[in-house]
């Protein structure tokens, strides 16, 4: 079962009151994500530096393995060539349909009720 699961959750009031803040945050986040995709060891080293007391990060190679696995899942086939975080309307609808059928999502809704690509750069 393929479902979308990662994303940035934003309160509707923030969208209404400060959309430029969301744009700036997502611009920085997508730049960081794109850089980390090309430089995974450097990204992991920065994470270890930020959280030196993390028992998980202290395990040699574990953080890099997890990053590589997670990174591979972050780009849905329909989002190929897009900025990190961009989602295809079809993928969102597929996820909504699965959740409505198997997880009793109600009301079912449509993409615009849950997701937008409008604040992403590019």
Where are the predicted features?
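Conserved C-terminal helix/tail region of periplasmic/extracytoplasmic solute-binding proteins
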Residues: 90-122
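Short secondary-structure capping/turn micro-motifs that flank functional sites
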Residues: 1, 52-53, 115-116
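A bilobed periplasmic-binding-protein/Venus flytrap-type ligand-binding module shared by bacterial periplasmic
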Residues: 4-20
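Secondary-structure end/capping motifs
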Residues: 17-102
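Short Pro/Gly-enriched coil loops immediately N-terminal to beta-strands
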Residues: 1-4, 92
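Poly-acidic low-complexity segments
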Residues: 11, 39, 55, 88, ...
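Residues that recognize and position ribonucleotide moieties
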Residues: 1, 8, 85
């Amino acid at each position: 079962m393929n479902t979308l699961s990662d994303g940035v959750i934003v309160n509707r009031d923030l969208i209404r009151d400060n959309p430029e803040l969301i744009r700036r945050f997502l611009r920085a986040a997508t730049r960081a994500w794109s850089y980390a995709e090309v430089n995974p060891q450097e990204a992991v080293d920065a994470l270890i530096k930020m959280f030196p007391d993390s028992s998980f990060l202290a395990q040699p190679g574990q953080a890099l393995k997890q990053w590589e696995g997670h990174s591979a899942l972050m780009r849905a086939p329909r989002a190929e060539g897009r900025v990190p975080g961009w989602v295809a309307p079809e993928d969102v609808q597929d996820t909504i349909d699965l959740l409505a059928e198997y997880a009793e999502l109600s009301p079912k809704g449509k993409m615009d009720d849950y997701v937008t690509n409008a604040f992403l750069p590019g």
